[in-house]
Amino acid sequence: MGAAVVTALPSVDARAAASPSVDLQPYASYWYPDSLPSGTPGPGITWRSLKEWRAEDDVDLAFNTASVPLARRFAPVPVNRTARRGQARIQALVSFEHTAGNPSQGAATADYYALSHWAYLDELVFWGGSAGEGLILAPNAPVVDAAHRNGVPVLGTVFLPPTAWGGDLRWTRDLVRRDALGQFPLAAKLVEVATAYGFDGWFVNAETDGGDAALGADMLAFVRELKRRGAAAGLRITWYDAMAVDGSVGWQGALNGRNQDFFRGADAMFVDFRWSPASLRASGELAERLGRDRYELWAGVDVEAHGWDSSVDWDAIVPRDRAHVVSYGLYRPEWTRGHLPEGRTPGQFHAADDRFWTGRSLDPSQPDTDGWRAPATVVADRSTVDRLPFATSFNTGHGLRWYERGRVASGAEWNHLGLQDRLPGRRWVVRSAGRRPAVSFDFDDAWRGGSSLLVDGDFDAPATVELYATRLPLSPSTVVELTHRADEGAVTVELAVALREPTRPGDPVPYTYVPAGRLRAGRAGWTTASLRLNGLAGTARSLGVRLTAKGRARWRLGALAVRESGATAPAAPARLRVTGSASGAEGTSLRFAWRRAPGPVRHYELHRVLPGGSRRFLGGTCGNAFFVPALKPEGGERSARFEIRAVDELYSASAPAFTVHSW
């Protein structure tokens, strides 16, 4: 049966509205520089020219625009004696989906690379681009919002592929074509895109061979102009070690005379995987002679195929017995999801991801000495928890269900990284004189969102679980709330608060403990303990919990909040409306938009009001537009009622704005 399409507002263009096969699902934007391939694009692919892009004509702009500003970060005293501050940094190149397949606002599956170890990252590249889909890929809003909440900048990708992978030199020439004034229109366009969408710059990878010295000179001038224009907008540019200054492609595996001008023209350079200990040592020295920071060089570490079993000469990059040589870039760490079998669960993914980022010990205070040098053992973690209010429900940005106040508000799987909370950076530091309990994100139950924090073990001594490095000001009116539950056994719970940091890296955090109650399985379900920190003044430097039990116990933490008393609900959004609809065999897809609420808002949540008056969660976003697929009438209704609420940092919800859609 063919699809019928109705548009409510001109945010879906007339051509799309007239098409009987229109798909209203918005995706992250991708383009060719200008000229398009010959032939016909494959299913689900739209060929576009960046040269022709204009923000005012972009019907998906509201869906792809990030809303969270880049947070400031601080580096606490390292949790071990191997991680360092002020030396090597880590970049990650992540393909969340193929170029044309990145939904703008999450999707109805929990099977997603929900990156969450932001504490160790300094730059995320939203990796993509292919000859058959498009060469320039802008990151989607959920990824940018999650990264920014944790202080990590995100770059889009400009990928000019090798001819063996379908590359065509005309696309390189399109990119660096000058206008009548000798300037580069597409450099300006790339800056315009990043500024409009709210991300932080571009990773430029020119690998199409066959160029000459003139093309090399044009590319260098293009990169310089891109950096100059980008710097004025607060953007950064990373160059990939491929094209040389003479226009040829020759991966150097080093910073040298063939590519140093590109490094000087950009903010950083990714050194191709062909590096050696000698080439990295020479690269760092050359960077410093050029007046640059050696840690602006990312040595490529390819983990796409083997993950933590990858063979890496770590001492060439981050030796343990002397200063780090350069920084490094992890190529395709989403292996932690991809290597798992079909049917993988969110819990299995996070177990693998923790193993990758923390190490085999699953405790960064106990760094491993095996062949995999996990990031937690190399670089000091960073945190953005430095102001009130602060709250978390340990929501990882995907789940099997959606919970509100401990009850299921939607039984559907989902993912949306923009809804991800700031999560514990040190996973999982547990200090005990006895047996160590296991700590994990659990998806079988939650207080809010899709997950909670679960501590499970056979206790023979108190165990302190370190949760957050903080810089939170304390006053007599400061309140800390723990929403928690005992699933098995009886557990005595204490809030752990530190007013100072350890003197040396690797030393235990000097906590003070505040009683938070004793819970017994099967008694009261979820319980919220509100604690005033009487006698504790100054700045909270770390937060955790201490658990005491005898024998087997399972304790679940659903939420943690630190606030001043007297919090109020946020103002409501307005003008919720349907901006596009498309009906087909699987139901009706709707595009929604609304006017943002005045004042601070963490995100917005969209619900459907069912005929009986109950509400079903449809999704959430930090922006002001959302897409919902496959809706159907329920209970004989002739129209469906929807409501949008603003949610603040403490998860207080505003009054709703409503709209109705007739079937």
Q: Model-found features: residue ranges?
A:
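Extracellular carbohydrate recognition and processing domains
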Residues: 504-540
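Short carbohydrate-recognition loop motifs
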Residues: 433-464, 518
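Conserved aromatic anchor
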Residues: 586-601
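Extra-cytoplasmic beta-strand recognition segments
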Residues: 464-497, 527-532, 543-545, 560
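Chitinase-like catalytic core of GlcNAc-active glycosidases
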Residues: 83-282
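Beta-strand-rich modules
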Residues: 626-660
